[in-house]
Design a protein with these regions (language model features):
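Intrinsically disordered, low-complexity non-transmembrane regions of multi-pass membrane transporters
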Residues: 86-114, 244-258
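Inter-helical loop and helix-membrane interface segments of multi-pass membrane transporters/permeases
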Residues: 22-30, 37, 54-57, 148, ...
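Alpha-helical transmembrane segments
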Residues: 62-79, 259
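Alpha-helical membrane segments and immediately flanking helix-loop junctions
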Residues: 1-57, 162-180, 185-209, 218-221
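Transmembrane helix-loop junctions in multipass membrane proteins, especially transporters and channels
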Residues: 59-60, 78, 82-94, 139, ...
Length: 260
């Protein structure tokens, strides 16, 4: 319960860290870890409401709708996963409790600090890697080529121009989408999808978990699409004035890259 809550509200990739901790302590099985991973990836409320809603779109109300949409999509996925998993094994008995309880405080502090530092270095490394990749794609003209490809399939230019960064890195993608005027539903998709940068952080963190990367990415896609759908519904019942979605990029472009 707590791990699911942290995964949905603690920001990327806190859910994966919680799953790893439960698996390492023997409180869940590999199957349960795989199921939890399908719906416990989410951005934190500070990033969604403050940065994306208030900062990029100019509306706290829109940010709240985005956050509720993301939570709703995750809950739908969690319910579906639970329905398909009904009748499978009961939760595993905790096997790591005794060793955790007997660990000296000094050792626990050292382990916690080492784990935190390792996670932070990993996160920063992937952010730098994907930021560099985006620059290479942009400078080489590949991003422009892909934009034309996306447009040829009927995707509006304001979405096609920012789809590559959205697919790769959520902060850069969200900023680009807002600057292009792609609208709240598209940003909601970006937040639900989370970007390959976050996905690779999770893959690195959960090397001990045997799971299909393709299935995981498919659930990320479903999460993004459901988030966008719920945002459309939310904006229908709680409409926001059009002025909210005007060019945020003029004042914010490039200024939020380090604020995720």
């Amino acid at each position: 319960g707590a791990t699911v809550l942290i995964g949905l509200t603690g920001g990327y990739p806190s859910g994966a860290r919680g799953i790893k901790a439960l698996l390492d302590s023997g409180e869940i099985t590999q199957k349960q870890a795989r199921r939890m991973l399908c719906f416990t990836v989410g951005a934190g409320p500070a990033f969604v409401i403050s940065v994306t809603g208030s900062g990029l779109l100019g509306s706290v109300q829109t940010g709240i709708i985005l956050f509720i949409s993301q939570l709703s999509a995750a809950l739908v996925l969690g319910i579906l996963v639970g329905l398909f998993a009904r009748g499978e094994e009961a939760p595993a008995e905790a096997r790591g409790g005794a060793s955790s309880a007997s660990m000296p405080v000094s050792s626990a502090l050292v382990e916690a600090a080492s784990d935190g530092a390792s996670s932070m270095i990993s996160m920063c490394s992937f952010v730098i890697l994907f930021s560099a990749l985006l620059v290479i794609l942009d400078q080489s003209g590949i991003s422009s080529f892909l934009k034309e490809v996306f447009s040829s399939f009927g995707l509006p230019d304001r979405m096609a121009s920012s789809l590559v960064p959205v697919l790769l890195e959520v902060t850069t993608g969200s900023t680009a989408a807002a600057a292009a005027g792609a609208g709240a539903p598209f940003l909601s998709f970006a937040l639900g999808w989370a970007g390959l940068c976050v996905d690779f952080q999770i893959f690195s963190m959960l090397r001990s978990v045997s799971f299909s990367k393709a299935v995981f990415l498919l659930f990320r896609l479903f999460h993004g699409l459901l988030s966008a759908l719920f945002t459309v519904i939310g904006l229908h019942f709680f409409p926001i004035t059009e002025t909210v979605f005007f060019s945020t990029g003029q004042s914010l472009s490039g200024g939020l890259a380090l604020r995720a």
